[in-house]
Amino acid sequence: MAKKVIKMVKLQIPAGKANPAPPVGPALGQAGVNIMGFCKEFNARTSDQAGLIIPVEITVFEDRSFTFVTKTPPAAVLLKKAAGIESGSGEPNRNKVATVKRDKVREIAETKMPDLNAADVEAAMRMVEGTARSMGIVIED
């Protein structure tokens, strides 16, 4: 028989930098999970993606064991890295902060493809372009 799930926790943690301090500690402590065990395993799995924020979905079972699935970094984080900026525009309709080439957008869309509910890469590209537009980033050919 399958183990009974008691809690699902979704977090966004910098790759390779999970530690028991907030937000990780309190979120997992409430569920009674071995926090250090999670941190070590997460850091080992994400050590190759340093500098990116990795969304993670942790499933906690009745016997306090857990499994977790790492997702691809958010499109906004990948766009900021591609454009070389610290943050998006406060007024994206007025102030444009950077430009990104369309082939870079395709690359980001292909990276995000497993986590997006898009039929093809073109649809995923449109989603990423929409994120860029709302951040004040101009897409050029």
Curated annotation (Swiss-Prot):
SMART domains: RL11. Keywords: Methylation, Ribonucleoprotein, Ribosomal protein, RNA-binding, rRNA-binding. One or more lysine residues are methylated. GO terms for molecular function: large ribosomal subunit rRNA binding; structural constituent of ribosome. GO terms for biological process: translation. GO terms for cellular component: cytosolic large ribosomal subunit. It comes from the Bacteria. Forms part of the ribosomal stalk which helps the ribosome interact with GTP-bound translation factors. NCBIfam families: L11_bact (TIGR01632). Belongs to the universal ribosomal protein uL11 family. PANTHER family: 60S RIBOSOMAL PROTEIN L12, LARGE RIBOSOMAL SUBUNIT PROTEIN UL11M. Part of the ribosomal stalk of the 50S ribosomal subunit. Interacts with L10 and the large rRNA to form the base of the stalk. L10 forms an elongated spine to which L12 dimers bind in a sequential fashion forming a multimeric L10(L12)X complex. This is Large ribosomal subunit protein uL11A. It comes from Halalkalibacterium halodurans (strain ATCC BAA-125 / DSM 18197 / FERM 7344 / JCM 9153 / C-125). The lineage of its organism: Bacteria, Bacillati, Bacillota, Bacilli, Bacillales.
